[in-house]
Structures are given as C-alpha cells and as structure tokens.
C-alpha cells in the first residue's frame, strides 16, 4: 500500500498540483494585501475617506461606533465592506488566472501550428464511385472509370 501511495504521489500531475496549490495560496495572500492595503485605501480616499473594511449594516438595533465593537458585542451585522474587499480580491485573481490561461493556450496553439506540417495529398476521391484512389491514378481500380482529370493532365 505504501508503494502504491508513493507511486501516486510521485506522479507528475500530483506534484504539479501541489506546487500549484502552494503558489496559488501565496498569490492569494499577495492579492489580498494588494486589495486591502493599496487598492481599497485609494478608492476609500477618492469616495470620501471611507474605510471599506468598517462598512456594515447593524441588524441588532443597538448603536456601535465600529464593526469591531458590533462583533465584540455579538451583534448581527451585514459586513458589505468586507464583502466588497473580497469581491475585488476575487476579480483580480480571476482576471490574473484568465490572462495566464489565455497565454498558455496561445503558446499551445503556436507550438501546435509549428508542428503541423503541410502534408501533400496522396489520395483523391473517384468522382464516379466516391472511393479513395491514388492521386496519380488515371482509372479507378474499384469502378474502372476513366478519370478525365488525369487524362487531361497527361496530354
């Protein structure tokens, strides 16, 4: 059983997946910091010195000065400011992944086009019986029809 697990874990796909998860986690932290520490303060400043992480709707009916106070008191709140931060965070990650996947697909198509070599046709269809025949044939071996194209070319 250990041997099977070792073979499974050492397959390229599993290791690639593990590396992707680790890099994705680190990338997520960077994007979260970008949103929380750089983008949202600038947007907050532009719309009137608002800290989006403190925007909430108090459902308890009591008065609180901040989201932290409401949460400490156990009040029910709708934290739409944190939701906006997470939404922007998601959009940045989704757009980044879209760009990476688009570039990977572009690279795959580029290499695929390079590999596609123009192969010269060696067969054609008989106009009478529609079977595949050699391109140089002057008579169809299946229906024995004389092929006009080949006779015209040889004259």
From Swiss-Prot:
Keywords: Cell membrane, Ion channel, Ion transport, Membrane, Transmembrane, Transmembrane helix, Transport. PROSITE patterns: MSCL (PS01327). It is found in: Cell membrane. Its main location: membrane. InterPro entries: Mechanosensitive_channel_CS (IPR019823), MS_channel (IPR001185), MSC/AndL (IPR037673), MscL_channel (IPR036019). It holds the Pfam family MscL. One of its GO terms (cellular component) is plasma membrane. The chain crosses the membrane at residues 14-34, 81-101. GO terms for molecular function: mechanosensitive monoatomic ion channel activity. Gene3D superfamilies: Large-conductance mechanosensitive channel, MscL, domain 1. It is a multi-pass membrane protein. Belongs to the MscL family. Homopentamer. Channel that opens in response to stretch forces in the membrane lipid bilayer. May participate in the regulation of osmotic pressure changes within the cell. This is Large-conductance mechanosensitive channel. It comes from Clostridium perfringens (strain SM101 / Type A). The lineage of its organism: Bacteria, Bacillati, Bacillota, Clostridia, Eubacteriales.
């Amino acid at each position: 059983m250990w041997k099977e697990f070792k073979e499974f874990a050492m397959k390229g796909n599993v290791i690639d997946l593990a590396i992707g998860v680790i890099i994705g986690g680190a990338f997520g932290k960077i994007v979260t910091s970008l949103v929380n520490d750089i983008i949202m303060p600038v947007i907050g400043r532009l719309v009137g010195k608002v800290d989006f992480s403190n925007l909430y709707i108090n459902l308890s009916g009591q008065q609180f000065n901040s989201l932290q106070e409401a949460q400490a008191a156990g009040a029910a709140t709708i934290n739409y400011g944190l939701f906006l931060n997470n939404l922007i965070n998601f959009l940045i990650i989704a757009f980044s992944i879209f760009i990476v996947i688009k570039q990977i697909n572009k690279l795959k198509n580029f290499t695929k086009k390079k590999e596609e070599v123009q192969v010269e046709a060696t067969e054609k269809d008989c106009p009478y019986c529609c079977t595949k025949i050699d391109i140089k044939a002057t008579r169809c071996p299946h229906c024995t029809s004389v092929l006009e194209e080949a006779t015209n070319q040889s004259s």
